[in-house]
Amino acid sequence: MSDQIRASGYFYSQTDDPFAAAFWSQFQDPHVLAARHIPADSSASAAMKAYREYRDRVRKPVLATYTILGFLSSGTYGRVYKARLRTPPQLASSSGTAGIANANAGTGSGTATVGSGASTAKKRGGLLQQHQLLDSPSSSLHATPKSVADGAGVGVNGTPSASPSLSASLGTSTANAPGGSDNTLQLSSNELPDTQIYAIKKFKPDSKETDATIYTGISQSAMREISLNRELSHVNIVTLHQVMLEDKAIYMVFEYAEHDLLQIIHYHSTALRAPIPLAVLKSLLWQLINGVAYLHANWILHRDLKPANILVTSQGVVKIGDLGLARLYSSPLQSLYNGDKVVVTIWYRAPELLLGARHYTTAIDMWSVGCIWGELLALRPMFKGEEAKMDPKTKAAPFQTDQLKRIVEVLGTPNKDRWPAIESMPDYKGWWPHLRLDNYPKTLSRWYATRNKGDDGYELFNSLLQYDPEQRLTANQALEHAWFTAQDPKPTANAFSSLAKPHATYPNRRVIQDDMDPKMKSNYVPPIKSHHMQPWHQVNLNSSQPHRLAQLMYQQEQMRHQQMQTQAPAPAPAQPPAATAVTGRLGHAVGAGSSAVGTAANVGGPAAPPPIAIGSTAGTGGAIGIQSSAASTAPSQHMYNNNPLITIAGTNGGTISNPATVRSSHSIGSTESITPTTSSQPIPAQPSSAPLARTTNLVATATRNQQRKRQRN
């Protein structure tokens, strides 16, 4: 069994949870354990149903890991919530094992379930990382140079210039924008972000619109976003930490960004009533284009760039998000048009898309970047046309006449000189009669000068808003433009570094506490079962509560037998006690100062796997190991009789075989402790009652019993 930690919750490492590691090490595969909870005489469909119920039952719920702080936004995909990583309770600790000692301290590190907080987390798959960029797939698309992808400065003539490293909060030292050290803000340790805050995106499951909801599977948008985000790793791309499945809904856990470009634009237009400072605007644009260059170098079209999808952290780092419409274009299984007939929000849609192009390139993303630049200047959408709605019957994409008119009013009427391939566009013939009536001149330079208070950067701006996609600059060409590399102010890694102190940032994102979904409310407490508990929740063997595990297991045993007596009480044959054997399923075995526990004979009854021994060497310390038991030739009558035994080794030779001597707790989180036996005289064995003589089930068996009841009915 590998010591790797898996997010599914099936396996644990020996250092993080010795008890769970000892238990799960008995099974080569989690499916083996699931199969043990399926009745032997069940049909194939019933067995599969039972297996799926068990699999869903042991899956860790979202709210067992995160606390919902409030609702952020919603869309056609679902809803987005702000969440905090749950902090485990601080148990009294002494010189514990390294795994338990580090468990409380390493909550935010995310090495187990949520991934590291750094944006350079190791990704799986074949997509490129910042240091593994391929050559250009065509003459019009160039791979991002390492100096650009890593964030190193690009000076005049493309020569890398020295740039100070970005703060440790980004998890990488290769995220700096070009420019000298005077233009980059060095973040101190007290300015590091809270790495325990996340954004949870809940996808609604696809369902048919009928009276009875029928789930059809995972949406295409969710599949794209999950598959791409798991592969990408870049400082200007939002990081996906974890994907969770619960109640037929998908939860994607992203790094949290406090701002977005739409929020910044709204704040300047309503509260400040002032334009965005040039230094801030240039830094935001450079980081945005840097992220787009990384996507294009990895053969990815974003296809939905707009201010609401461009996130910005409190440290002024741009994060491109929402890859629901993104697509690999290197070797598509079908044409781009057949997959999605309508892409890009209408105000940021390129002219070739508006004219029904069946094939398009990365130039559509660069047009969107130009539209975002214009919106940052004007504090309102640059081409705000009225969208024509799609006919629900024909599902045909309508012709967007008003949107094209808004573009022509600023860029002028297109012709073959400015766009040689315009007549080959599928919808050009239907648009041509409108063009002959309206002949507009190009007023882009005047539009730019009145909002930028000068012509600085107009050449780059004009190159992004070309009718002909072949004439638009690529992302890498834009990064090397003189407006970024030669003209002051230079872009910085922290876009907010030039803002006035001490409040060198923007207001935090609005968080709504009143949410329609009661399960996702901030005051909701999820029903966390024992197999959902974190290792430090389950037991701290070297703390002041060395027998906490026995307390939990005894409580679980009592609950199981109460349900069995209510449903179908059946007396079990009592097992004769032995001098050196554990007759009860929960008792003390002779330890005599050693963490190893002697062999416990299983006299009569079904065969059982090796029991789990909890030894104590110093009164308050403890260790866990696997104890072998004698195999019995009697056939197994009940499936739950194949579970491991639990024995507890005392410190002074005391042997307790009566499980009732271990007091139970009413709550898993109770602080009640159990005082170990310290008497030098061995405690005489007492006969165990029939219900308590059965196997202690280490997995929540209440659900299994309910399942059997349903099968009988």
UniProtKB/Swiss-Prot annotation:
Pfam families: Pkinase. Belongs to the protein kinase superfamily. CMGC Ser/Thr protein kinase family. CDC2/CDKX subfamily. Keywords: Activator, ATP-binding, Kinase, Magnesium, Metal-binding, Nucleotide-binding, Nucleus, Repressor, Serine/threonine-protein kinase, Transcription, Transcription regulation, Transferase. It is found in: Nucleus. SUPFAM superfamilies: Protein kinase-like (PK-like). The active site is at residue 304. Residues 104-120, 158-175, 673-691 have a biased composition (Low complexity). This is Serine/threonine-protein kinase SSN3. InterPro entries: CDK, Kinase-like_dom_sf, Prot_kinase_dom, Ser/Thr_kinase_AS. Its cofactor is Mg(2+). The gene is SSN3. It catalyses: L-seryl-[protein] + ATP = O-phospho-L-seryl-[protein] + ADP + H(+); L-threonyl-[protein] + ATP = O-phospho-L-threonyl-[protein] + ADP + H(+); [DNA-directed RNA polymerase] + ATP = phospho-[DNA-directed RNA polymerase] + ADP + H(+). It comes from the Eukaryota. ATP binds at residues 72-80, 201. Component of the srb8-11 complex, a regulatory module of the Mediator complex. It is an enzyme of class 2 (transferase). Residues 129-142, 657-672, 694-705 have a biased composition (Polar residues). Residues 104-188, 657-713 are annotated as: Disordered. Gene3D superfamilies: Phosphorylase Kinase, domain 1, Transferase(Phosphotransferase) domain 1. SMART domains: S_TKc. The keyword Nucleus applies. One of its GO terms (cellular component) is mediator complex. Component of the srb8-11 complex. The srb8-11 complex is a regulatory module of the Mediator complex which is itself dependent transcription. The srb8-11 complex may be involved in the transcriptional repression of a subset of genes regulated by Mediator. It may inhibit the association of the Mediator complex with RNA polymerase II to form the holoenzyme complex. The srb8-11 complex phosphorylates the C-terminal domain (CTD) of the largest subunit of RNA polymerase II. Its EC number is 2.7.11.22, 2.7.11.23. Residues 66-484 form the Protein kinase domain. One of its GO terms (molecular function) is ATP binding.
